[in-house]
């Protein structure tokens, strides 16, 4: 909204100048209020999205708790709390600066340590909160891969290092205005004329967390009893499918802040006089997210039925999350029909990675490396195949002839950028987190003792079980709860009566 006192003066006649100045002043005030209101709405939208993403920590905690054995429940839930707490402090001190401290070089940020000089025109407290929620999500992914056998001090060290340095550097590369591969670069020097497209973090979040977990689990080795002497896999099932389902639905809910919230703003008009604005893109992103997850869940359901003969709810939950991890990178730049393809292939990737992990005797209690690493990598490739040019221009700035999806007629440049992203993330996380886990192992700070692992860390490290196996009130013996395990069969095999222990 604009106003010219000179133009108004001609129309108003005598004493026109004062009247024109007054009218323009009032219109200017109204215009400023509109700007302030738009900023407040966008800021509220980002804060609400941050709250949704943070709620995913509860989902991670429940998912992890249900996926491990009961004797390690307190341990895994404590590590999830630790991820958020340690991540909050180290992301405040270092992480946000390394990620978004502009102006900086293409490798790492160098401003805003401890949020110094914030707020600015490009960085605000709400943006820090939102990005912190992403950082601790990456750390939460890693904790699942090394569950049930890792020392508590190792969790503290790796979580702080990941959220304070490793993850922020990757997010700087692909999400900041200075990153060498970022599509947001202000100097126009884009990788393959497009930059690597990873809208909400299939690579930046999921691959980082998954590959870090991969190295942790590889260096630690499998849990005791996971494979027999002949190398055959033995299922060490989690103790609560109910918690797995609860955690999955909480993560699903939080993903609506994870993906649509990554727009950061909602009051952006694309075409004047139409309904086509960022508010519509936000809705489309929520739809693509939903369709990818639902398709992956159903594909996993029937795929596992064919492979194992069972309808397994925990496998379906993992398939659902694999679809979400895959669509995260391209959720805003593809059509809803393409999201169905994304989810279908993500389920196949997850099933294939799980088969490969079993053959290689790789043990990941939550399938985190397969789910987040494998499906995240597929999500980046999927974006290179199906990204729409008009959506890329709306989000990343209008650039005529911008490279887009290969299958959409956009050539292979975007695919090249996405493959480079996969390679550099794999290399960076392997070099940093792999080295860290190796050092921790050499210092005997990584894996717990065999005795602790057999007994369970809840009892040996955390002072007791997460659940009451019996009622401490001796006057109510009749309502004691007991674990029931089968007796070893007699030579004749006749005695199959369960024995309380």
From Swiss-Prot:
Family: Belongs to the ammonia transporter channel (TC 1.A.11.2) family.
Cell compartment(s), UniProt: Cell membrane
InterPro entries on file: Ammonium/urea_transptr, Ammonium_transpt, Ammonium_transpt_CS, NH4_transpt_AmtB-like_dom
Keywords linked to the UniProt accession: Ammonia transport, Cell membrane, Membrane, Phosphoprotein, Transmembrane, Transmembrane helix, Transport
Function per UniProt: High affinity ammonium transporter probably involved in ammonium uptake from the soil, long-distance transport to the shoots and re-uptake of apoplastic ammonium that derives from photorespiration in shoots. Contributes with AMT1-3 to the overall ammonium uptake capacity in roots under nitrogen-deficiency conditions.
Tissue specificity statement from the Swiss-Prot or TrEMBL entry: Highly expressed in roots. Expressed in root tips, root hairs, root epidermis, rhizodermis, cortex and pericycle. Expressed in leaves epidermal and mesophyll cells.
Gene3D superfamilies (UniProt xref): Ammonium transporter AmtB like domains
Modified residues (Phosphoserine): 475, 488, 490, 492
Pfam families: Ammonium_transp (PF00909)
Molecular functions (GO terms): ammonium channel activity
Induction remarks: By nitrogen deprivation in roots and nitrogen supply in leaves.
Disruption phenotype: No effect on ammonium uptake. Higher expression of AMT1-2; AMT1-3 and AMT2-1.
GO biological process, one term: lateral root formation
Species classification: Eukaryota, Viridiplantae, Streptophyta, Embryophyta, Tracheophyta
SUPFAM superfamilies: Ammonium transporter
Phosphothreonine found at: 460
Quaternary structure, from the entry: Self interacts. Interacts with the receptor protein kinases CEPR2, At2g28990 and PAM74.
Keyword Phosphoprotein attributed: yes
Name by which UniProt lists this protein: Ammonium transporter 1 member 1
């Amino acid at each position: 909204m604009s106003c010219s006192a000179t133009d108004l003066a001609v129309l108003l006649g005598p004493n026109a100048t004062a009247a024109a100045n007054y009218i323009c002043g009032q219109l200017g005030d109204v215009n400023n209020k509109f700007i302030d209101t738009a900023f407040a709405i966008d800021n509220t939208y980002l804060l609400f999205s941050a709250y949704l993403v943070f709620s995913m920590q509860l989902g991670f905690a429940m998912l992890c708790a249900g996926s491990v054995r009961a004797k390690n429940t307190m341990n895994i839930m404590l590590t999830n709390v630790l991820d958020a707490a340690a991540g909050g402090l180290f992301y405040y001190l270092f992480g946000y600066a390394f990620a978004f401290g502009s102006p900086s070089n293409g490798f790492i940020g160098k401003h805003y340590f401890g949020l110094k000089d914030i707020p600015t025109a490009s960085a605000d407290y709400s943006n820090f909160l939102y990005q912190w929620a992403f950082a601790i999500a990456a750390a939460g992914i890693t904790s699942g891969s090394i569950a049930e056998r890792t020392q508590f001090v190792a969790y503290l060290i790796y979580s702080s290092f990941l959220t304070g340095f490793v993850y922020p550097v990757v997010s700087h590369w692909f999400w900041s205005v200075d990153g060498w591969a970022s599509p947001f670069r202000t100097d126009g020097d884009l990788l393959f004329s497009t930059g690597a497209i990873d809208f909400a973090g299939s690579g930046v979040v999921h691959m980082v967390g998954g590959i870090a977990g991969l190295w942790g689990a590889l260096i630690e080795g499998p849990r005791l009893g996971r494979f027999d002497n002949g190398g055959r896999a033995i299922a060490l099932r989690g103790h609560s499918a109910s918690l797995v389902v609860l955690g999955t639905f909480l993560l699903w809910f939080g993903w609506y802040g994870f993906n649509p919230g990554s727009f950061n703003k909602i009051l952006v008009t694309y075409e004047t006089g139409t309904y086509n604005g960022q508010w519509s893109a936000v809705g489309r992103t929520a739809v693509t997210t939903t369709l990818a997850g639902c398709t992956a869940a159903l594909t996993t359901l029937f795929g596992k039925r064919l492979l194992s003969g069972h309808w397994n709810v925990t496998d379906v939950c993992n398939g659902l999350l694999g679809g979400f991890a895959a669509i995260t990178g391209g959720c805003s730049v593809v059509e809803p029909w393409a999201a169905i393809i994304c989810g279908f292939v993500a389920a196949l990737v997850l099933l294939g990675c799980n088969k490969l992990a079993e053959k290689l005797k790789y043990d990941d209690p939550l399938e985190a490396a397969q789910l987040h690493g494998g499906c995240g990598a597929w999500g980046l490739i999927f974006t290179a195949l199906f990204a729409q040019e008009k959506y890329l221009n709306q989000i990343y700035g209008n650039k005529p002839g911008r490279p887009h999806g290969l299958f959409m007629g956009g050539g292979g440049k975007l695919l090249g950028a996405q493959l480079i992203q996969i390679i550099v993330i794999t290399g960076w996380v392997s070099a940093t987190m792999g080295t860290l886990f190796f050092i921790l192992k050499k210092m005997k700070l990584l894996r717990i003792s065999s005795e602790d692992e057999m007994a369970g860390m809840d009892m040996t490290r955390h002072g007791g079980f997460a659940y009451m196996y019996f009622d401490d009130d001796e006057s109510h013996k009749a309502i004691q709860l007991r674990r029931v395990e089968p007796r070893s069969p007699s030579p004749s095999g006749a005695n199959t009566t369960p024995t309380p222990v």
